[in-house]
Curated annotation (Swiss-Prot):
The record marks R265 as: Neutralizes the sugar carboxylate group at subsite +1. GO terms for molecular function: lyase activity; metal ion binding. The lineage of its organism: Bacteria, Pseudomonadati, Pseudomonadota, Gammaproteobacteria, Alteromonadales. Residues 1-29 form the signal peptide. This is Ulvan lyase, short isoform. The keyword Signal applies.
Length: 528
């Protein structure tokens, strides 16, 4: 594999926004209706349009206080403001929205600071009803302190097409059993993993029957009481509990055959592994976790330990992994991440037959990440001093149904005040029939990249309003095909794409730690 480089100091110019705008009425499940304005000429020409907008709640949790650090997190505010560690977002964040038949399911935490309950909403597109279940569990907070918000503690969500069960994994950040002398001070003994699931058919019940009673209580020896819906393992066997320790970032996927897969990160930022498991709908139980790569890589012969920042995805019938590496070597050029790495499995469940981007067999579980490295974004900045290159955020990847492979990443100088400061956004892509990657800096950057059909999309917010850019798979020829220009302004959101539609789950801009959530369904104009 070779890299074809197309560097450019000039970012691509976005397509001029359309000349004509028209107000579109928006469907809402609330008493008051909302209106959004989008470019009508742009939307009509590309077949991309806002299908509906629905308010899900008026009060979801958001962190509105000060960002704390390792020197200040033990002294959070005792007032109404909600201080936090890492980021402000916890609702409409992570793997929080999934369509199923004529329903859309969404997870969130209840606002404000004193509430924090795990919540599950179901929007019935036929009746227009949003029905919400409140769970007893409340957001744990950073290292078990509920006064410090923790943005990593997202709520992963899935619905099984095979039996209509609902699955949620939530509110954890590498928690383990420890004692008073440990990092978590014994706060997570027999409570370090949180899994909730429903009885079969719960996803399909009438609106008035969608209640907490459809979920299965924990009656095991580690149950925390009669209203405990949290299970310590996904296998139903407490002897497996060590397999469910120290995990973060739950994410579910569904195969074309309706099988559910799930993965999480085991370990920490610079010493971690991706673990995945599968749901057996007939037995109504999940398998134990299987590693994609080994943690503690030095003990397996590698020169250093490393962690993963990216995603495992199930696309086109294959389990795939794309990530950037965070090395435990703190004296190299990279302050945080480096590299672009990719692998896929030809086994339907990912249990072997793993290959690099060129189709060559790799070691499984992986130890030496260089076996699957594609290129080094840090090479686009020539700084050589330790920790001088900053790569955080702006990384994602996808594969079209034609097998066009795309990666995006962002790199800059760590010191923003240095005289030779550099900042570069990169798009690397390989069309399905091409042997080599094209790597271009003629790219304005993005946080995520998506696919539907043979097209790729960048979807996000501009001035608080959703926009969509589209390009043909295997190219860098993006154009703006949708831009909302008025209506509710949003702070952030998370996106799930399925059957040619983007389910954009959004938090409204506002003040305080209890803010509204909305669901926009955007038709991407993809034939299906």
């Amino acid at each position: 594999m070779k890299l074809n480089l197309k560097a450019s100091g000039v970012a691509r110019q976005l397509t001029t926004l359309a000349k004509t705008v028209a107000a579109l009425s928006v469907l809402t499940a609330c008493a008051s209706s909302n209106t959004a304005t989008v470019s009508s000429a742009m939307s009509k020409a590309n077949g991309v349009f806002l299908e509906s907008q629905t308010k899900i709640t008026n009060g979801a949790l958001h962190f509105d206080g000060k960002k704390l650090n390792h020197n200040t997190f033990e002294k959070p505010s005792l007032g109404p403001e909600y201080d936090y560690f890492f980021g402000k977002n916890i609702s409409a964040h992570g793997d929080a929205v999934k369509p199923y038949k004529h329903y859309v399911f969404m997870t969130w935490y209840k606002g404000g600071k004193e509430q924090r309950n795990v919540m599950l909403s179901r929007f019935n597109t036929k009746t227009g009803v949003v029905k919400t279940i409140q769970f007893p569990h409340r957001h744990t907070g950073f290292r078990g302190n509920p006064l410090v918000g923790e943005s990593h503690n997202t709520i992963g969500l899935a619905v099984s097409p095979k039996n209509g069960t609902i699955h949620m994994v939530y509110d954890m950040h590498a928690y383990v059993d420890d004692d008073e002398s440990g990092r978590f001070k014994g706060r997570f003994v027999d409570d370090f993993f949180r899994y909730s699931f429903s009885v079969p058919g719960a996803a399909d019940v009438p609106d008035d029957e969608f209640t907490l009673e459809k979920f299965v209580k924990d009656t095991s020896e580690v149950s925390q009481g009669t209203d405990d819906f949290k299970h310590l393992t996904m296998t139903g066997n407490l002897e497996d509990k060590d397999n469910f320790s120290a995990l973060t970032y739950p994410k579910f996927y569904k195969s074309k055959e309706g099988e559910l897969l799930h993965y999480m990160r085991w370990g920490g930022n610079n010493n971690g592994a991706y673990y995945f498991n599968k749901y057996d709908a007939e037995k109504q139980v999940w398998t134990r976790f299987t590693p994609f790569n080994h943690k503690d890589q030095e003990t397996h012969g590698n020169a250093y330990n490393w962690g993963l920042y990216g995603q495992m995805k199930y696309i086109n019938g294959k389990l795939r992994v794309g990530f950037q590496q965070r090395s435990a070597n703190n004296n190299d050029r990279y302050k945080y991440q480096n590299g672009v790495y990719y692998a896929y499995s030809d086994h339907p469940d990912g249990l072997g037959d793993w290959k690099n981007v060129d189709g060559e067999n790799m070691t499984w579980p992986l130890v030496d990440s260089d076996e699957i490295k594609i290129f080094e974004p840090g090479d686009y900045i020539d700084h050589q001093e330790p920790n001088s290159v900053h790569i955080v955020g702006g990384f994602d990847w996808t594969v079209t149904e034609n097998e066009d492979l795309h990666f995006i990443t962002h790199v800059r100088s760590t010191n923003t005040k240095r005289s030779d400061y550099k900042e570069v956004s990169i798009h690397a892509f390989k069309p399905a029939n091409a042997k080599d990657f094209t790597v271009t800096t003629d790219f304005t950057g993005a946080d995520s990249i998506y696919t539907s059909g043979d097209s790729i999309f960048i979807i996000g917010l501009k001035n608080g309003y959703p926009f969509v850019e589209k390009a043909k798979g295997g190219t860098n020829e993006f154009e703006v095909v949708y831009q909302q220009t008025s209506g509710v302004k949003f702070d952030h959101g998370t996106i799930h794409i399925e059957n040619g539609k983007a389910y954009y789950y959004l938090m409204e801009k506002g003040a305080g730690n209890s803010l509204p959530l909305h669901l926009q369904v955007i038709d991407l104009g993809v034939s299906r």
